[in-house]
Amino acid sequence: MSEQIINLLITGTLDTLQMTIVSTIMAMLLGIPLGVILVVTSKGHILENVALNKVLGAIVNATRSVPFIILMVAIIPFTRMVAGTSIGTTAACVPLTIAAIPFLARLVETSIKDINFGVIEAAQSMGASPLQIIWKVLLPEALPTIIDNVTVLIVNLISYSAMAGAIGGGGLGDIAIRYGYQRFQADIMIATIIILVILVQLVQMIGDAWSKAMNKK
């Protein structure tokens, strides 16, 4: 494998990491709060608001139901408005983030719903406000599983970023399609697959270790 190809793979890996990291950060900033809101506004919870809960739930379900490749194409005008372009790694971060937010929100919602409601009632009996319950009870109790959720999200975003290469998103997916598929260079196709597998394994190992460490605390 020539030095040019190695440099190409390094650039593609860095582009994939950029798309994944940016999208993960944005998804955490918006998806985790959305997941919390979906829980606390549900019927019988600390900030019950059934109407808001149903609206947010419908939006989340609608977004999650659209396959990623279709979502990328459908929001090209919005991507161009936000990123100034519809191709490249920066542009790919927009649909990746939009796909990631509802995905993480549902995972976080499930994690928080698994918390024993007796813990919440105990905090309420001691006079804790809804905000205090969220920050000091719900999030700490659900933290290990939220870390697992973020790990699952990152693994999905790595695969989504590879799909983004199909329509000019850059990264390893773009390299695999342009060189491995269109030019029949099997060595490059295999190399991109190996790199993607290594990235996923590393993310899973780190996420599992972090979750176990937080669980012990």
Describe each PLM feature range.
Residues 130-161:
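Transmembrane alpha-helices
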Residues 90-91, 119, 130-132, 143-144, ...:
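Residue-level recognition of membrane-helix boundary sites in multi-pass small-molecule transporters
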Residues 37-43, 125, 189-217:
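C-terminal transmembrane helix and the adjacent membrane-cytosol boundary/short C-terminal tail
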Residues 1-7, 167:
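Short membrane-interfacial helix/loop motifs at transmembrane-helix boundaries
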Residues 112-142, 182:
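Short helix-to-coil transition segments within interhelical loops
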Residues 78, 149-198, 208:
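Non-cytoplasmic
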